[in-house]
Amino acid sequence: MNNQIDFVLPVLYDKFLSEMGEDGEFNLEDSGITLYSKADLVERNTTYQIEEWEPDYLMIGQDGDLAFFIKKDSDDTIYMNDLGALGSIQMEIAASDVYEFIK
């Protein structure tokens, strides 16, 4: 993965990132879920080799071994999958968009 996001982010997710700011993380209260800032997205996806195992998705956060994704050049749906099962089992839908996800 190069040093920048080279596809169009979903509208609501892009808005969420803008509201969060360039740095930092969003921690979902009492859940263990962390959503990454725009500055961390490329590094996290490179570290976990997401491009190799799930090339159509971008990891946007995680809760331990459970990761959360958006589909590249797609709608605002948030998906989830176990990091140890990437590429071998289908993504599950977690929410219709990031704002529903953080409720």
Each predicted region: which residue ranges?
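A surface-exposed partner-binding patch
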Residues: 1-69, 74
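A short, surface-exposed interaction/processing loop segment used at functional sites
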Residues: 79-98
